[in-house]
Amino acid sequence: MEVVICSDEQQVGQVAANRVLRWVEGLATPVLGLATGSSPLALYNELARRVAAGEVDFSCGIGFALDEYVGIDPENPLSYRQTILRTVVEPLRMDPTRVRVPNGSAPDLATAALEYDRAI
């Protein structure tokens, strides 16, 4: 494990973006794990800046959200699906049909979890 000490949130985003881009460099279909919350926002903001600058293209990428609330409508603005669409998919210009979020409103959550695991 490597510990990297950064001076501020912006530097955290830059360092993290550099690592992500090294991992996906040359991949025709990069696959990203997508978390919600405030921790990854600096990374997402820096990746969005680089997308806007033409330095990287995630339009063919695939995304998998880490989690979703149980029982929430996926169209609810507070759902993780909508959060991921707003904070990641739109700014990174990803195809929303290529981004998966666990189905927290499925009638059989165990089956939905297995299907999601298989998709990953």
Describe each model-derived feature in a short phrase.
Residues 56-120:
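Ligand-binding beta-strand-loop-alpha-helix segment within the catalytic cores
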Residues 7, 38, 104-107:
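Short beta->alpha linker loops
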Residues 26-53:
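Glycine-rich N-terminal segment of FAD-binding domains in flavoprotein oxidoreductases
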Residues 1-32:
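N-terminal glycine-/serine-/threonine-rich phosphate-binding loop
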Residues 6, 33-35, 64-66:
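Short hydrophobic segments within beta-strands
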Residues 17-25, 48, 52, 85-89, ...:
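Generic structural signal for well-ordered alpha-helical scaffold segments
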Residues 16, 43-47, 74-76:
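Short, glycine/acidic-enriched capping/hinge loops at junctions between secondary-structure elements
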